[in-house]
Amino acid sequence: MIALTEQRKEELSSLENLDADLEELARQSKKALEALQATALKLTTSRQEAAARYDKAVSDILHTLGMPKAIFETSIETQMLSPNGADKIEFTLAPNPGEGFKSLQKAVSGGELSRVLLSIKSVMADLDRVPLLIFDEVDSGISGEVGNSIGEALKNLGQHHQVLTITHLHQVASRAKNQLAVSKEEIEGRTYTHVVELDHDGRIKELSRMLGGESDTIREHARQLLEV
């Protein structure tokens, strides 16, 4: 009976202290939330500072890849706290003067997206260790010196990643370590695709074709491209 009485006294004491315990928990919760918000604010500030440098670096590379007026911008908007902070982050692009910023996920053409990706990967080359990168239409609608710039950017990127590029430009193809020729053939009403790895002589022949002919002068030009 005495033991039961003591037990009831302890239970009653616990109930009497419940309000105090709840107040302490509320105080601790508020303190933790304030610390979390302060940390999230620091993270937001760091992201904004890094984004300014990052956006300029990506835009500068885009200007050499046939998009001289393009502006790349990292959009940072406030959202509810999450494990990733209090920011909603989206990469956007204004391809030409007078055009608004477009989400890379929604309104950018394939060629533009490939060049943006090439620019991003070039900026992040030393940090990003994705083993394989594939570029399609990266040279869409361009030629001349811009083609050389794209070829050089892809070649530099190949020092950090394996890069697979589908191209129609000799400036790009000539900078590859390995070159494959893709052709289609119709046999009895069906279309077949052939892929052939080219040796040195095969590359000269294919580059000559891409240059527009197979004269001795063009073949010599193709040979020189492989020596650059």
Residue locations for each model-derived region?
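Walker B catalytic acidic pair
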Residues: 136-137
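GG-anchored amphipathic helix commonly corresponding to the ABC/SMC/Rad50 NBD signature/C-loop
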Residues: 95-97, 111-133, 157
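C-terminal lobe/lid and adjacent interdomain/linker elements of RecA-like ASCE P-loop ATPase modules
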Residues: 145-228
